[in-house]
């Protein structure tokens, strides 16, 4: 566009009608003119629309403070109080950063993302915590398995493919996907074998960590909407990952030994503090520092992009019993609802719940193993109950879980046997 000279007196703004003499500048386009005052007005309107769009349902944390987030987590996740507090603060800061009013943004202060790394044994609730956070915040959520990822050019899933499932969870709404949460499970499995840089290509380890860096930090990635490898004829969708919250989780078996060695080096001699040797694996994970993750095999750049470290403790028998009974979607409540559909009241005794917890601990599967234990114990009665009539109550006691006995059935006036 050209600026109109002072001599072109016949020209006027196509929007407000002011002449060249009435404005400071008049910009010319093909058969159209716009003055500097209309340009300023347009800028103000655009700014109002940007702020307004955040007020029209885009804000993720309407009035939710960290205490509220933790309280919501308490409804679904038993125990892990410290981890829930860490996550509540990190999530609150993340979405406040995204939803900050335009007038409060200061170019001199750049608020960086606080991606999260979750440490904890299998079945301690890492995936559940991340999933529940997304549910509380009403944002799209997806889970990716780090062990299936490879560098570009190798057989396996491209790192960018982890964005595809998030896009699908957002019903292909790119704007919603760009504010979602991605949980990358088993991140510990792609640690390099030693903490020294490798001279050879490591398809499933360091190479994948390098590939994850840009996506986790923030980049515009082109992804095939239906997944799979990219090819020239395929339509690609651009996703900006700058505001996607990444939570990486893993059991990190052996990381406790790294922490113990670090603690031991600082206390050598007659006055050495032996407390580190007496701590459990869960207690050692609570003391993890970034340098321990480097020793374990995560590359420095990736550790730097995961500044928030939260550890989850191994669940005790009491924790598992509470998980069976207390959350809003507790397993016992789910089974009770299934029996309610058949018109039967289902009751679990305290002994039966303790027996389920003991079996899950023996299998070293934590909370994840509770459902399989219950499914096995309840198979016969769930097979029979639709064929029985006049059953009013089914009581599951300890022997049903430990010895495979049949539950106690209480009938009404008329009792009907299996045919």
From Swiss-Prot:
One BP term from GO: cell division
Domain ClpX-type ZB: 1-54
Annotated Zn(2+) binding sites: 13, 16, 35, 38
Domain of life according to the entry: Bacteria
Keyword Nucleotide-binding: yes
Keywords: ATP-binding, Chaperone, Metal-binding, Nucleotide-binding, Zinc
Positions contributing to ATP binding: 121-128
Gene Ontology cellular component terms for the protein in this record: HslUV protease complex
Gene Ontology MF terms: ATP binding; ATP hydrolysis activity; ATP-dependent protein folding chaperone; protein dimerization activity; unfolded protein binding; zinc ion binding
PANTHER family tied to this protein: ATP-DEPENDENT CLP PROTEASE ATP-BINDING SUBUNIT CLPX-LIKE, MITOCHONDRIAL (PTHR48102:SF7), ATP-DEPENDENT CLP PROTEASE ATP-BINDING SUBUNIT CLPX-LIKE, MITOCHONDRIAL-RELATED (PTHR48102)
Role summary: ATP-dependent specificity component of the Clp protease. It directs the protease to specific substrates. Can perform chaperone functions in the absence of ClpP.
Subunit (UniProt): Component of the ClpX-ClpP complex. Forms a hexameric ring that, in the presence of ATP, binds to fourteen ClpP subunits assembled into a disk-like structure with a central cavity, resembling the structure of eukaryotic proteasomes.
Assigned protein family: Belongs to the ClpX chaperone family.
Name of protein: ATP-dependent Clp protease ATP-binding subunit ClpX
Species for this entry: Desulfotalea psychrophila (strain LSv54 / DSM 12343)
Name of the gene this protein is made from: clpX
